[in-house]
Amino acid sequence: MGNLISFMKEVANGLRESGNYGTAHIYRSSMSAVISFHGSDKLPFRKVTQEFLKSFESYLRGRNCSWNTVSTYMRTLRAVYNRAVDRHIAPYVPH
């Protein structure tokens, strides 16, 4: 099973290399927030649960992040996770 942070770095680097600098910056900012919340740059995909996501959202709101920032970071996490599922790196978890 893969590591969310490593995969986010890989995706952000690919975006930067293809000239999508703004999107790459958002991915890196989101990644930094996840690392700050989790306390480590090692986060297995299996630990990215509904409870983890709710706690992360609460953490961001507790840091006085705007709703737009919270929404952007959560969307970014969803996009990265879905990309990992497509590549069979992360498990598909139906809701």
Positions of PLM-derived features:
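Short, charged hinge/linker segments at domain and secondary-structure junctions
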Residues: 47-50, 83-95
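Hydrophobic, aromatic-lined core segments that form the binding pocket/scaffold
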Residues: 66
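DNA major-groove recognition helix of helix-turn-helix
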Residues: 74
